[in-house]
């Protein structure tokens, strides 16, 4: 759900 390290 986070935009951080979203692959």
UniProtKB/Swiss-Prot annotation:
<comment type="function">
    <text>Myoactive; induces a rapid concentration-dependent muscle tension increase.</text>
</comment>
<protein>
    <recommendedName>
        <fullName>FMRFamide-like neuropeptide PF3</fullName>
    </recommendedName>
</protein>
<feature type="modified residue" description="Phenylalanine amide">
    <location>
        <position position="7"/>
    </location>
</feature>
<keyword id="KW-0027">Amidation</keyword>
<dbReference type="GO" id="GO:0007218">
    <property type="term" value="P:neuropeptide signaling pathway"/>
</dbReference>
<comment type="similarity">
    <text>Belongs to the FARP (FMRFamide related peptide) family.</text>
</comment>
<keyword id="KW-0964">Secreted</keyword>
<keyword id="KW-0527">Neuropeptide</keyword>
<dbReference type="GO" id="GO:0005576">
    <property type="term" value="C:extracellular region"/>
</dbReference>
